[in-house]
C-alpha cells in the first residue's frame, strides 16, 4: 500500500472518550509499523437550542441548551497491511463516531 494515506475522523459529544479512542488508534497503528500524523483537534461544533420554559405563556422566560460535538483527525501515512488489519480488529466505544477514508 505504498503511497496511500488513510484519514480517520472521530466525532463524539464526550471529549475524554474521544481522546482515549484517538490515543488507542495511534498506539495500535504505531505498534504495527505505520507512520501516524495526529490526532489533530478540529473545531468544536456548538449547537444551541432555545426553549420556552412555560407551556402556555411567559415568553420572556427561556432556557438555552447546547450540544457540543468534539472532533479529531488522524492521518496514517503509508499504512502496512498489518496496521490495517489491527485497525479493523480494534474495539472502540459506541459513543465515538468513526469515518475512515482511503
Curated annotation (Swiss-Prot):
Function: Involved in the binding of tRNA to the ribosomes.
Name listed for the protein in its UniProt record: Small ribosomal subunit protein uS10
Domain of life: Bacteria
Coiled coil: none
SUPFAM superfamilies from the UniProt entry: Ribosomal protein S10
Assembly: Part of the 30S ribosomal subunit.
Cellular component terms (Gene Ontology): ribonucleoprotein complex; ribosome
SMART domains: Ribosomal_S10 (SM01403)
MF terms in GO: structural constituent of ribosome; tRNA binding
Similarity field: Belongs to the universal ribosomal protein uS10 family.
Family annotation (Gene3D superfamilies): Ribosomal protein S10 domain
Gene this protein is translated from: rpsJ
Database matches in Pfam families: Ribosomal_S10
InterPro entries the record matches: Ribosomal_uS10, Ribosomal_uS10_CS, Ribosomal_uS10_dom, Ribosomal_uS10_dom_sf
Species this chain originates from: Leifsonia xyli subsp. xyli (strain CTCB07)
Listed GO biological process terms: translation
Keywords, in A-Z order: Ribonucleoprotein, Ribosomal protein
